[in-house]
Structures are given as structure tokens and as C-alpha cells.
Design a protein with these regions (language model features):
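Metal-dependent nuclease catalytic regions and adjoining charged, substrate-binding loops involved
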Residues: 4, 94, 177-256
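Nuclease catalytic cores
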Residues: 9-54, 86-90, 94, 114-115, ...
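A short beta-strand motif that forms part of the nucleic acid-binding face
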Residues: 25, 152-155, 196-198
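Short small-residue beta-strand/loop micro-motif enriched in glycine and branched aliphatics
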Residues: 29, 156-160, 203-206
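Structural motif
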Residues: 29-37, 164, 236-242
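Short amphipathic alpha-helical face segments that pack within enzyme cores
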Residues: 41-44, 170-178
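A non-catalytic, helix-rich entry segment at domain boundaries
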Residues: 44-121
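Non-catalytic protein-protein interaction segments used by genome-maintenance enzymes to assemble
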Residues: 112-172, 180, 221-224
Length: 256
């Protein structure tokens, strides 16, 4: 069964032609840099902390960061930034578990870590399609609520515009919808959060941003998903000109 992830949906929304280059033509675009290596390393620590409450998160971070950097092409690595990130990451990962416990004092159970979603998209009738995703963390509190959490590494945080940007919040909207479907849980018992892990912030380095997902937002996210699937299956691949100045393929042989 074919599938679509939120990452793919986001690329399609950015530009259908860009989506075609990446997913149909298999043209490699952005393959990572120092920032993505940092993010992957911090994510790995968060996973280890929640499962095992590791005593030395700094050591786990350092090992994972060095490994992720080694996967990058030499010209993609900013070595001065790497040195800064080693210090910043070591400080940041020590704060994650205390922050989770403070935000959710009645946390009673870890439901899953890095949980895979592969749920059928029932609204799309043209052909079978699954929604694919990986949920960083789901915990349950003693009031019976489930809390879906997505770790996001960043520099100093998000402004109010980014916190409300549909193409950010729809990720959690769809995760909530399909996680609840997978587990036959009432959607009203599921709450969602971005956990911002701030590399350069002086205070509030771990911030939980609650994302509300009412019926209207859920419908809007589902409508966007349906629109993308319809156009992808119909072979529609128009260029979204408003995205050209932010596109890595602009003025290349792939998109002259």
C-alpha cells in the first residue's frame, strides 16, 4: 500500500513540482548539515532518557553527535559550530527529563517512544493509502489523558507566528488523528505538544507548546491531505512560484 508522511505532505505544499523532483524523479536535495546532525543526536538522547533514565545523557549525546557528524559530507560541516554545539548540547540534554517531569507531574506511564504509524486514510477513496509517521513520545497521566510529544531542536525558540503556522501544527493534528485511530482512543483524550529544545536560549531551554486540535483544525488538515493525494495521483505538478526563492533546485538543470 502506498503511503504519505507529513514530511512529504509539507514538501508538496511547498511546491508540487518540488515534490515531483524529490519523490518521483528521486533527485537528491538537501541531505543534512551540522544542525540536522545536532537534532538527530538530541532526539536519540531524549529517547534514551525516557526509556532508561540514563545517568549520563551528556555521554550519549556526545557519542551520537560525533556519529551523526561523521555521516555528513565534509563541505556540509561547520567545525566551529560543531564545537559550540558540543557544549550547548551537553547542557541541554541534562534538562530534558526534569522538564518533562515538571510539565507532567502526574505522568504515570510511558506508552511509546519513537512509535511508528501506518494507518489507512479512509477518506481517500481513489486507491488505498496509508499515513506514515513516527511519534517521538506518548505518555499517559493519571487523569486518563494521553500526551503526544514531538521534540523540536531550535536555536532560541519559536515566535508566535511559527507556533501557529498551519504547516507546523498540522503535523501534530494528523499524528493525533491517526494515533487515536490506531489505538481506538477517543480523540478528546489525546493532547499534543511540541517540546522546543533551545540550543542558544539563556532561560527556558525546554519549552512545551501545547497544540489544540479541534474539529475545524482537524478537518482543515485532513482536507489538505486529501488535496495533496488527489493531485499527486492525478500527476498534477505545477510550480508554486511563491516558493522559488527558497528552493534548492531554483535555476538548476532540474528547474531552470
Amino acid at each position: 500500500v502506498p503511503h504519505i508522511s507529513f514530511s512529504e505532505l509539507k514538501k508538496w505544499d511547498f511546491c508540487p513540482f518540488y515534490h515531483k523532483l524529490v519523490y518521483k524523479d528521486k533527485i537528491k536535495g538537501f541531505e543534512g548539515n551540522t544542525h540536522t546532525a545536532f537534532g538527530k543526536a538530541v532526539h536519540k538522547v531524549c529517547e534514551s532518557i525516557i526509556i532508561n533514565e540514563v545517568k549520563e545523557p551528556k555521554a550519549v549525546f556526545h557519542e551520537e553527535f560525533v556519529k551523526e557528524i561523521s555521516y555528513l559530507k565534509e563541505d556540509c560541516v561547520d567545525w566551529n559550530l560543531v564545537d559550540q554545539m558540543k557544549t550547548q548540547g551537553s547542557e541541554l540534554v541534562e534538562l530534558v527529563l526534569p522538564a518533562v517531569k515538571e510539565e507532567f507531574p502526574n505522568w504515570s506511564e510511558v506508552i511509546s517512544v519513537e512509535e511508528q504509524l501506518f494507518e489507512s486514510i479512509d477518506e481517500f477513496s481513489t486507491k488505498p493509502y496509508d499515513f506514515k509517521g513516527y511519534i517521538d513520545l506518548v505518555i499517559k497521566t493519571d487523569d486518563g489523558k494521553y500526551h503526544v510529544i514531538d521534540w523540536k531542536t531550535c536555536s532560541w525558540g519559536w515566535d508566535s507566528r511559527r507556533k501557529a503556522d498551519p504547516m507546523n501544527v498540522y503535523q501534530l493534528t494528523l499524528y493525533k488523528k491517526y494515533w487515536a485511530k490506531k489505538h481506538s482512543v477517543c480523540a478528546e483524550d489525546v493532547e499534543t505538544y511540541f517540546a522546543l529544545l533551545k540550543r542558544t536560549a539563556k532561560t527556558n531551554k525546554v519549552e512545551f507548546v501545547r497544540v489544540s486540535n479541534g474539529k475545524k483544525r482537524t478537518q482543515n488538515a485532513t482536507d489538505l491531505l486529501m488535496k495533496a493525494l488527489y493531485n499527486i495521483n492525478a500527476g498534477v505538478k505545477i510550480k508554486k512560484r511563491t516558493s522559488c526563492n527558497r528552493c534548492e533546485f531554483r535555476r538548476t538543470e532540474h528547474c531552470p
